[in-house]
Amino acid sequence: MPTTELDGFTFACGDTVDSLTVAYRTYGDYTGSNAVLVCHALTGSQHVRGRADGDDRGWWPDIVGPGRPIDTTEYFVVCANVPGSCHGTDGPPADGPGGDPWGTAFPPVTVPDWTRCQRRLLDTLGVDRLHAVVGGSVGGMNALDWARRYPDDVHRIAAVATAPRLDAQCLGLNAIARRAIRGDPNWNDGDYYGGAHPDRGLALARQLGHVMYLSKASMADKFGRRTATTDTALPADPAAEFFATRDVESYLDYQADTFVARFDANSYLYLLRAMDAYDLAAGRPSVADALAAFDGDALVLSFTGDWHFTAAQSATVADAFRAGGAAGVAHHVVDSDYGHDAFLVDSAAVGPPLADFLAAGTDGAAVTDATGGV
């Protein structure tokens, strides 16, 4: 797995680490003008297309790859695991200066920290100006942050299923997720690496997340009120023998079980905080003012069934790009019942506008604009 060391990295909080390890993947060949940075979502990784050893398919294999919408025979694709995560880039579970895991002594991270980390990584790769930055969910916030902080370094921005900031409902749900982790006795104020991990709290937090990522329609279609047979529940439910176990519970148990095996609880807390804290307009009068220096093309892609980041929120981003003076702006709305997860699973709807936008900007044949229609 490729990594690089960034010397003397200073976080937004003011803390500096002597060296920051950043794990990343590249796909395709760099020609000098074809670099596309892909920003992963909350618990994603650098393996957008899959691991080099073929161990899994990655998190966006139907969008990134040879002959895919982000065609790796045409574009040089870069994806980096963000600071604070646990897929190879330094974060709470990584070894600190003394050789033990950082835990909660790792500096707090922000979305702008991710952006500056990516800029420095690209410098080491010899990439100056990006053809495009593409990101979904909090990765979409990361993409928008590029338009604010490095407007001259990117030609096109594709912000998918995202918003300039979280609303109160999402902030509240994230607070519940954090409390589930911190309320687990094994969390031990984040110092759990030598013993039992707070798997119960992390499982609950992830189950809440999966409910947030689906829509009412998709849950009704996928699960309804059907009952299921299960031997275990995660977390364990002492009252389970008195009640029927529903299909939706079985699904949540499975998702929690697989997630706690691959993710770190402290990293989850750090990344949630970064998403909670982000405000594209911070320190500026408005979102439009924050985006005013970006004069390239912007695609804002949203989904009708997404209540996590709604189409109406995306419309405000598109309006801000227009008011800021971007060369071309389109708000492409996908009619989908998949919920927030649509950007990951509905590749037939996501792929064509994304491919055409990368190729021709907002003039792309499959790119539509819902201005005034949301």
From Swiss-Prot:
<comment type="function">
    <text>Transfers an acetyl group from acetyl-CoA to L-homoserine, forming acetyl-L-homoserine.</text>
</comment>
<comment type="similarity">
    <text>Belongs to the AB hydrolase superfamily. MetX family.</text>
</comment>
<keyword id="KW-0028">Amino-acid biosynthesis</keyword>
<keyword id="KW-0808">Transferase</keyword>
<comment type="subunit">
    <text>Homodimer.</text>
</comment>
<dbReference type="InterPro" id="IPR008220">
    <property type="entry name" value="HAT_MetX-like"/>
</dbReference>
<feature type="domain" description="AB hydrolase-1">
    <location>
        <begin position="34"/>
        <end position="346"/>
    </location>
</feature>
<dbReference type="Pfam" id="PF00561">
    <property type="entry name" value="Abhydrolase_1"/>
</dbReference>
<feature type="binding site">
    <location>
        <position position="206"/>
    </location>
    <ligand>
        <name>substrate</name>
    </ligand>
</feature>
<keyword id="KW-0486">Methionine biosynthesis</keyword>
<protein>
    <recommendedName>
        <fullName>Homoserine O-acetyltransferase</fullName>
        <ecNumber>2.3.1.31</ecNumber>
    </recommendedName>
</protein>
<feature type="active site" description="Nucleophile">
    <location>
        <position position="137"/>
    </location>
</feature>
<feature type="binding site">
    <location>
        <position position="341"/>
    </location>
    <ligand>
        <name>substrate</name>
    </ligand>
</feature>
<keyword id="KW-0963">Cytoplasm</keyword>
<keyword id="KW-0012">Acyltransferase</keyword>
<dbReference type="InterPro" id="IPR000073">
    <property type="entry name" value="AB_hydrolase_1"/>
</dbReference>
<dbReference type="GO" id="GO:0005737">
    <property type="term" value="C:cytoplasm"/>
</dbReference>
<feature type="active site">
    <location>
        <position position="340"/>
    </location>
</feature>
<comment type="pathway">
    <text>Amino-acid biosynthesis; L-methionine biosynthesis via de novo pathway; O-acetyl-L-homoserine from L-homoserine: step 1/1.</text>
</comment>
<dbReference type="GO" id="GO:0004414">
    <property type="term" value="F:homoserine O-acetyltransferase activity"/>
</dbReference>
<feature type="active site">
    <location>
        <position position="306"/>
    </location>
</feature>
<dbReference type="GO" id="GO:0009086">
    <property type="term" value="P:methionine biosynthetic process"/>
</dbReference>
<dbReference type="InterPro" id="IPR029058">
    <property type="entry name" value="AB_hydrolase_fold"/>
</dbReference>
